[in-house]
């Protein structure tokens, strides 16, 4: 595919294999470009871990493949998001269940997007790196690369914590 953004212009469903290939190609192209800052917030509730990202307007991004099913809460904004076979345009507030096994791509429009992934966390783990290893297939770029840069420093904002 000459234009990796064509993933967002698809007018018909494609196979899961084709969609995955398009997401990976987009990811590779994006890693060659200047990176935008996406704020990540972590919230811990009893048995639940919420990871919220705040995505600036006009951003194109890819996520990591998820190892587990999870819930998504699109709190605000409009984003085109790849599914396993097509692209959906979602506007918050909106919630949905997301299956394991897929890497997604997103394209934000004129307003910032606030996107929260909600995961079961039965042992109430608060170690972000451990949670990432449980929840994602951590790529050699992106999450893993960022970990190497911060060398274990806790660079997350925790909010809404409750004492267990």
Predicted segments, located by residue:
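Glycine- and acidic-residue-biased ligand/ion/polar-headgroup-sensing regions
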Residues: 66-85
């Amino acid at each position: 595919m000459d234009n990796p953004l064509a993933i967002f212009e698809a007018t018909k469903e494609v196979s899961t294999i084709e969609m995955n290939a398009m997401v990976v190609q987009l990811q590779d192209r994006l890693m060659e470009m200047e990176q935008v800052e996406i704020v990540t917030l972590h919230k811990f509730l009893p048995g639940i871990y919420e990871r919220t990202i705040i995505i600036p307007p006009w951003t194109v991004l890819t996520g990591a493949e998820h190892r587990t099913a999870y819930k998504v809460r699109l709190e605000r904004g409009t984003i085109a998001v790849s599914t396993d076979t097509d692209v959906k345009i979602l506007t918050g507030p909106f919630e949905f269940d997301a299956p394991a096994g897929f890497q997604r791509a997103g394209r934000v429009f004129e307003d910032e997007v606030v996107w929260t992934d909600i995961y079961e966390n039965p042992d109430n783990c608060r170690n972000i790196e451990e949670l990432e290893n449980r929840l994602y297939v951590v790529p050699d770029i992106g999450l893993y690369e960022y970990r190497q840069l911060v060398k274990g420093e806790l660079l997350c904002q925790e909010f809404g914590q409750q004492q267990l």
